[in-house]
Amino acid sequence: MPETTGDQNAELRLKHQDYGSDPLAVRETGQYRAEYVMSFVEKWDELIDWRARAESEGQFFIDVLRARGKVKILDVACGTGFHSVQLMKAGFDVTSADGNAAMVAKAFDNAKDRDLILKTVQADWRWLNRDISGKFDAIICLGNSFTHLHEEADRRRALAEFYAALKHDGILIIDQRNYDAILDHGFSSKHKYYYCGDQVTAEPEYVDDGLARFKYSFPDNSEFRLNMFPLRKNYLRKLMSEAGFQHIHTYGDFQETYQESEPDFFVHVAEKLHPEAN
């Protein structure tokens, strides 16, 4: 597995996912870099389906940011660039970051194909302010990405780094899969939001309180897997509050009102509201 502090581009040379002899025992935060091998990254947009996802989300994130007067945005989990591109097209000043070099490269190429030049950087959230300078109006962490942090110490450290990178009145937007419903009632999905590709399936292969192992199956019969931590909604809200964030508002599938077990995904919007100006 490539080390976070070692070769920054090691995963670009990886051809296959490798979970060793006991995949369910692989529960380390640093594993995400080895999971997103280039062959998986190249297929990621089939899973998302940019057009369908844009239709399902509508103007949600654009409206949230505009309503609060936010302009300078840090996308800390840019993936293949979907949200960075949508926000750039809407006129926001976007910096796009990801811990995985293959994702950063793909995001840049996707933007270039749309006549946009992304400001990209490879950055691990746990050392975010080492790799990215300046303060931002908003940080977005989307695509169920926060779930890649397997240790609580890493979650707290990442939230502290997000807090430090925001301006005094900045906001943080984090989304997550509805793991509460999966843990308590089993898996079901409307397949309407986030992973909108209708030829691709994404479903849990194994779930316990400390691991959600998802399998992604593509039309060419290729399969990939991700080991993630099943974040409960109120647990993440508690971590955000303890990191200093206030007025945390949670949406279910982009709606303000919802039944707890119904949404496929939650979106948390929180404010820094530090009394001291920069």
Tell what function each PLM region has.
Residues 2, 6-7, 11-71:
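Conserved class I S-adenosyl-L-methionine
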Residues 77-81:
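Class I SAM-dependent methyltransferase "Motif I" SAM/SAH-binding loop
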Residues 82-128:
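Class I SAM-dependent methyltransferase SAM/SAH-binding core
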Residues 130-138:
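A short acidic, Gly/Pro-enriched loop at the edge of an enzyme's catalytic core
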Residues 137-153:
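A short SAM/SAH-binding and catalytic strip from SAM-dependent methyltransferases
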Residues 156-168:
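A short glycine-rich, Lys/Arg-flanked "PGG" loop and its adjoining helix->strand segment in the class I
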Residues 171-239:
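SAM-dependent methyltransferase
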Residues 235-278:
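C-terminal lobe and adjacent flexible extensions of AdoMet/dcAdoMet transferase-like proteins
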